[in-house]
């Protein structure tokens, strides 16, 4: 169903968005930025907060020395300690609520915008399903982990790299142990058989990836060429899959490619469904369903949609009006014009983030962004049709959607890592353990829902696809997502090497990850490649043992 966006609703949305932007800009201009706030804050140690025992003294410490550099747009520590001295529970509740919203933003942006742009680009470039499956669509499926890893390594607070490392390792452990384990237990009565060649290939490549990462951690440093070599292992994996499918008739490779396509269409954030997609349609369509007062169920559904629409409007509106979308079922000319107009304005705001808003340089950047936005909006309005998306010059539209969806994903991941780091200081928990658990679980819960649903409802083929996806995803996250982060960080330090502090506990997590792979290998081969309860229970025990050990170590450090 195409979008028939009403002009009145479009006007309301535009005015609302402009009011929000105006309030933000007004806040910047009416509160001059101290130049000291723009200087790096790494010369002080934020961990000194633990020596203060009340909110008032912590707030005074933050204001006097300002020791905690936040990667995000908000200073969460000052927000809590300086505004909720008398209501600490309320402040902590608001931070956890914001954490859930950030997970929603990251997952929803990746699935609805980023993946959509990648799929459209693969069609426009006439990529074969083989190449598209292991490149663009893998990038879409692994987007949350990719951006979280990039932010951890490339952000201003370089000390958060352990968050990125633990997130990738924790997510890989969760998917290969918990997700595969639950699938195996759920299918133990069906005695589903897994394709041998594909399983061996994925296990071998994953073990090679884990071994390479362990060597990097043990050595403690890596240069640009070493990081590039680590990342290029994923290119070797892609080439192996493609060649196996093209020349060897490898059905396992074909199943893996199909799994990536299915995951690309099924993988969605946990907060997205139950009406959110329909609410977003209601935002752009400007339609309200006429309900019969005598039909309680229909009236309940209407009000449910309305409440969810109102709650999600502040989250969805900025993205709707800054990310170009040109798909057949979501086309709206007013929204398209608005998105290409506001997108440069948003980019100019991000470019000026660390500048003093009233400076001459910031004003020039804002002026350039506004002029480019007006020009693009005029061109879009003059060259597009009201009812159908553009057929010519489609690449610039898709490239714009890709860039802006990537921008929003990076913003969400940046805030997520910044908030988790702050929560670590607030509760005295290492940010790395939060990356290993909270961030890894949040990014991987979609894999659990998607793969389990596929395995239960799509027969033996669905089970094969689900299990293959449980190994293909972590391979991508380890080699490409983590690899490209290392490449970017090493490039900044080139020709010097970047130092990665050796974390024995991270090596322990890698050891448990290998133990899970070995257990799966031994049980499957002894059971003629059939999934079963023994395999699933063993994987869950391994994961719980790994998690329990890390938690006990963290509690011991706290005392």
From Swiss-Prot:
Main localisation, per the record? Answer: membrane
As for membrane topology, the entry says:
Multi-pass membrane protein
Q: Which GO terms describe its biological process?
A: potassium ion transport; response to osmotic stress; sodium ion transport
Provide the protein's localization.
Answer: Membrane
Is-annotated flag, keyword Transport? yes
Position of the signal peptide: none
**Similarity comment text for this entry:** Belongs to the Ca(2+):cation antiporter (CaCA) (TC 2.A.19) family. Cation/calcium exchanger (CCX) subfamily.
| Protein name per the record | Cation/calcium exchanger 2
Name the species this protein comes from.
Arabidopsis thaliana (Mouse-ear cress)
């Amino acid at each position: 169903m195409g979008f028939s966006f009403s002009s009145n609703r479009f006007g309301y949305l535009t005015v609302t968005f402009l009011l929000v932007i105006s309030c933000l800009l007004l806040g910047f201009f009416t509160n001059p930025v101290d130049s000291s706030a723009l200087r790096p804050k790494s010369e002080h140690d934020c961990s000194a907060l633990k020596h203060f025992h009340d909110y008032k003294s912590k707030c005074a410490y933050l204001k006097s020395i300002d020791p905690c550099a936040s990667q995000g747009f908000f200073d969460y520590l000052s927000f809590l300690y300086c505004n909720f001295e008398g209501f600490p529970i309320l402040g902590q509740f608001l931070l956890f609520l914001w954490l859930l919203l950030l997970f929603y933003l990251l997952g929803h942006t990746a699935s609805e915008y980023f993946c959509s742009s990648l799929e459209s680009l693969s069609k426009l470039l006439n990529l074969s399903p083989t190449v598209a499956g292991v490149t663009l669509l893998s990038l879409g499926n692994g987007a949350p982990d990719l951006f979280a890893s990039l932010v951890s390594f490339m952000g201003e607070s370089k000390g958060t790299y352990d968050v990125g490392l633990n997130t990738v390792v924790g997510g890989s452990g969760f998917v290969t142990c918990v997700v595969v384990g639950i699938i195996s237990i759920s299918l133990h009565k069906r005695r589903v058989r897994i394709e041998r060649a594909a399983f061996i290939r994925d296990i071998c490549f994953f073990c090679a990836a884990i071994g390479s990462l362990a060597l990097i951690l043990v050595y403690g440093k890596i240069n640009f060429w070493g990081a590039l070599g680590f990342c290029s292992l994923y290119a070797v994996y892609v080439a192996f899959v493609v060649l196996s499918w093209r020349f060897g008739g490898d059905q396992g490779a074909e199943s893996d490619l199909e799994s990536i396509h299915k995951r690309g269409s099924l993988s969605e954030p946990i907060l997205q469904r139950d009406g959110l997609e329909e609410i977003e349609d209601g935002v752009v369509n400007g339609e309200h369903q006429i309900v019969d007062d005598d039909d309680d169920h229909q009236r309940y559904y209407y009000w449910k949609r309305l409440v969810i629409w109102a709650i999600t409007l502040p989250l969805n509106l900025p993205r709707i009006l800054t990310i170009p979308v040109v798909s057949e079922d979501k086309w709206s000319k007013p929204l398209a014009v608005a998105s290409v107009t506001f997108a440069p304005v948003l980019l100019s705001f991000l470019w000026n983030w660390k500048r003093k808003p009233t400076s001459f340089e910031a004003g020039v950047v804002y002026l350039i962004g506004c002029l480019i936005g007006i020009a693009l909006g005029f061109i879009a309005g003059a060259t597009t049709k009201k009812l159908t998306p553009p057929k010519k010059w489609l690449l610039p539209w898709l490239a714009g959607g890709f860039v802006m969806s990537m921008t929003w994903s990076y913003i969400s991941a940046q805030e997520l890592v910044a908030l988790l780091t702050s929560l670590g200081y607030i509760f005295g928990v290492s940010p790395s353990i939060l990356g290993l658990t909270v961030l890894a679980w949040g990014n991987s819960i979609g894999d659990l829902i998607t793969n389990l649903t596929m395995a239960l409802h799509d027969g033996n083929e669905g089970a094969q696809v689900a299990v293959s996806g449980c190994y293909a995803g972590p391979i991508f996250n380890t080699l490409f997502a983590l690899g490209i982060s290392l490449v970017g960080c090493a490039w900044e330090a080139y020709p010097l090497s970047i130092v990665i502090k050796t974390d024995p506990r991270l090596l322990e997590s890698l050891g448990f990850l290998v133990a899970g792979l070995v257990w799966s290998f031994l049980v499957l081969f002894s059971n003629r490649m059939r999934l079963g309860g023994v395999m699933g229970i063993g994987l869950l025990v391994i994961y719980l043992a790994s998690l329990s050990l890390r938690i006990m170590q963290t509690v011991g450090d706290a005392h």
